[in-house]
Amino acid sequence: MTSAQRKDDHVRLAIEQHNAHSGRNQFDDVSFVHHALAGIDRPDVSLATSFAGISWQVPIYINAMTGGSEKTGLINRDLATAARETGVPIASGSMNAYIKDPSCADTFRVLRDENPNGFVIANINATTTVDNAQRAIDLIEANALQIHINTAQETPMPEGDRSFASWVPQIEKIAAAVDIPVIVKEVGNGLSRQTILLLADLGVQAADVSGRGGTDFARIENGRRELGDYAFLHGWGQSTAACLLDAQDISLPVLASGGVRHPLDVVRALALGARAVGSSAGFLRTLMDDGVDALITKLTTWLDQLAALQTMLGARTPADLTRCDVLLHGELRDFCADRGIDTRRLAQRSSSIEALQTTGSTR
């Protein structure tokens, strides 16, 4: 099977998986304490966020998806158009296909051609050489670089990598060599606290936890196996909400993706400490089912609804959501107990001295 065929398979299987998903994930175990007089005025609300020297006007981004075949090049064209029209940052799919076969360069370059002034993120794997990382950056004139780590995907992948020991030193080399921010991301299995602390030591600028709850690439790769004999890896890892809770009080900026279904999930993730929140499969499905105009409408609606939620919760900025009281339930609460995370502090933080000094209220 060629790389292009595999990329097309990934799109097809991701859409099938999204259509079959039950709709519930651990974001549903996160709720806000409703303070009925916490609301502020909509003109006082900003969606702007910043991290690692990066400033975005919105706290959401179109996360890494695809590229490398004629079909996926058209998808990237439309994703870039939607990003341009809404001001939403966008990440490429893995550019390993381009590194191996430069003839598919246009399927990635279109992300910049259609979005010349937007924030575009290149995506590579953790075995990429420094020179090839720079090639990927240069091709799309990237503003930041994602390095994806995906042992649970590689393991059932028929042609997958089986050697992972080089990843840590190679991430460190790339982070030291390139002159744009480096973000290390999982692909749907989550980053533990220990992993994020290690990434900070390696010199990366941010981590995207990309937890369980959305596209399951172990399931996708197992679906490509003749015998489907790695079904026991389906659902491997920690949820996005669990990863964010595990990362409390770590200095390295954390982004969130994985299982983000709607603006309430975005607000939940921001309240748990994410600086920005990405989504992939839901945006892809809208594009494939209804076209680029529908995706533009969806992104615009999300931004409007995010501002509405911040207004109701009394959060002038996305960062202010970390002062809102949140309650944790079910298995997510059990995870916190086992990992030594104080859930009471999260439920009572609006009345803390720091929150009072910052907001002047008990929101």
Curated annotation (Swiss-Prot):
GO terms for biological process: isoprenoid biosynthetic process. InterPro entries: Aldolase_TIM (IPR013785), FMN-dep_DH (IPR000262), IPdP_isomerase (IPR011179). GO terms for cellular component: cytoplasm. It comes from the Bacteria. Its EC number is 5.3.3.2. It is found in: Cytoplasm. Its cofactor is Mg(2+); FMN; NADPH. Mg(2+) binds at E154. Pfam families: FMN_dh. It catalyses: isopentenyl diphosphate = dimethylallyl diphosphate. Homooctamer. Dimer of tetramers. PANTHER family: ISOPENTENYL-DIPHOSPHATE DELTA-ISOMERASE. HAMAP family: Idi_2. Belongs to the IPP isomerase type 2 family. This is Isopentenyl-diphosphate delta-isomerase. It comes from Streptomyces sp. (strain CL190). The lineage of its organism: Bacteria, Bacillati, Actinomycetota, Actinomycetes, Kitasatosporales.
